[in-house]
Amino acid sequence: MVRKMNKLAKRLASTSKSRQPEPESDSDGSEFDFDNAIEEKPMEAMDIEEVESDGDDDERELQAAFAAGLLKDGLNIQVAKKRPIINKSAEMKEKLAEITKDLPWVETLEVVTPHSEMDKKVENDDFQRELNFYKQAEKAVQIAYPRLLNLGIKVLRPTDYYAEMAKSDTHMQKVRKRLLGIQEMKERQEAFRRIREEKKFAVKVQKEVLAAKNTEKKNLAEAVKKHKKGMKQQLEDMLNNVKRHGLDQDDDAPTGAFGDRLGGRGGAGRGGAGRGGSMRNAGELKRKLKSDKFGYGGKKKGMKRNNKESFNDLFGAPRGGFGGRGRGGGRGGRGGRGRR
């Protein structure tokens, strides 16, 4: 039936295409291209009659099928029939009785537990359903365990039981070697990580120590600077006090060449430039003493060598003559180059 319907549809489509009118010429009056035109052969009268007769037969068949209720309104497609469910319980029980063997209970270990019904809520809950399975297995063990003990069958494993390994010793040695290698690699990585952390900690401690040292050095420099500033201020205060109050140089000044020039042991007077008198006067006195002893210019012929008289003159000279501190004298300058 379906093949006839498809065949009828193809024939109707071919006849509709053959009966289409030829296209008219363009409105602008252009000529038709006869060279490129496709020549169409007219259908013969016999072919048309065959198509019409076949179409009438197919239509009659479709009408008869529709009247018999084989066709429905709308799109008609062939629907495969479903295979009926086969449930031959009687035959299955007979076959079960044939294959059933009469074996002792030890060979089968069949245990029937009390039936426990499960509602829809428990069936849809995976956890509750698995829990019911566990309880059912537990009840089966409680039933089978005493029966096995009564039959004299050992159930529990002895303490000295040695089970043979499924894998050989060679394979287990390889596994052990592999595990030891993995453990050694982990220990090595842990050691490297610990060394890196120790290096980071050492660098951190070194930076902290260096920062503390720099801070201490800075604080010490500031303290020294403040101390120097205080000492300088204290020295300036002492000099100002000496200049302000002064000393009586005329009463304590000794007589003689050294006393007249340098102020004697009393130190510098009011017009002095430092300890022991003026730097200018000390230089002139030193130059005069050398000139008196060694002469003026020219070759001295070893006259600068020390002798008994010069030794005695050096240590016998008055101590306060070259700018030394006099009794009651104030603080003066550094003195000449010989003093230093």
UniProtKB/Swiss-Prot annotation:
One GO cellular component term of this record is:
nuclear periphery
Composition bias of kind Gly residues appears in 264-277, 318-333
Keyword Coiled coil (UniProt): yes
Instruction: Output one GO BP term.
Output: ribosomal large subunit biogenesis
Q: Where is the composition biased (Basic residues)?
A: 1-10
Kindly list the places in or outside the cell where this protein is found, as annotated in its UniProt entry: Nucleus, Nucleolus
Return the similarity comment: Belongs to the EBP2 family.
Function noted in UniProt? Required for the processing of the 27S pre-rRNA.
Protein name (Swiss-Prot/TrEMBL): Probable rRNA-processing protein EBP2 homolog
What organism is listed for this UniProt entry?
Caenorhabditis elegans
